[in-house]
Amino acid sequence: MWGFDGSSTLQAEGSSSDCLLKPVALFPDCTRENGFLVMSEVLNPDGTPHPSNARATIAEDQGLWVGLEQEYFLQQDGRPLGWPEDNNSYPAPQGEYYCGAGYCNVGDVARQIVEEHLDICLAAGINHEGINAEVAKGQWEFQVFGKGAHKAADQIWVARYILLRLCEKYGVDVEWHCKPFLGDWNGSGMHCNFSTDFMRDTGGKEYFLKLMDKFEEYKDEHIAAYGPDNHLRLTGLHETQSIDKFSWGVADRGASIRVPHSFVKDDAYKGYLEDRRPNSQGDPYKIVSRVSKTVAEVEAEYK
């Protein structure tokens, strides 16, 4: 355990400022000689979870597999890389930027950053699954997959930190906000792909429909856990469902839950699902915790 000043991090009052750090995951840091990054939980002085410690709300489940897709913008002086410097001007409309190549689509320094970030994450043992330029100009994504209820969320937090630190030397900022620019521009999400042992091995249409009913029942609870300002992003446009609605659909990126073709193949209804509502600035621990609780409630009927 390591004590720290919680008042300086807005986690405690100055008159009673001590908080504790409990290490939970260790990552080699290739940017330092013999260096490591330590992911820690925050505890109260008595050893109980601090109110900000959403990691402690996740029930351990090695059968829960989670893949998170972290989207973000790279910015300089408040404008995404590649956008005109004039605040009243915009780049060409979306269409050429997704998985784009060439200076006119992705510029020069952005790819250096995302490739270097990938290398540092891999050296750290983070299960970094890939990178791509996203739909809006200056927007990028990386993906992290983990087996076990905590792993993907731990690794997303560390990967975020690595990206922020890396961008310092390029004079570039990371914009995590889910809708930094209004208008005909995609927002940034953190789609949550998930499966359990039961979902992968047994599944079934009856189980799936019960699961979707439960996700709809807890629609508001899920939205509350999926990140701030989501009303700006979940509008029913730009590959989203409206924030006040719930829907699912096979291969439907305008639905709340996208069902892959592989899930319904041969009417098996088993595999993984994608919740498209979590946003880019959401707390991955809160996201995984909420998904896990809803799924566990349904699967309890089958045990």
Residue ranges and their predicted role:
Residues 1-133, 155-158, 172, 287-292, ...:
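ATP/Mg2+-dependent ligation/transfer catalytic cores
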Residues 35-39, 67-71, 139-141, 187-191, ...:
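Broad gene-expression machinery/nucleic-acid interaction feature
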Residues 40-43, 98-103, 142-149, 269-275:
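Glycine- and acidic
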Residues 42-48, 105-106, 146-152, 196-200, ...:
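A generic structural motif
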Residues 71-81, 133-145, 177-198:
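Histidine-centered divalent-metal-coordination microenvironment in nucleic-acid enzymes
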Residues 83-92, 188-198, 246-248, 255-264:
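Short beta-strand elements
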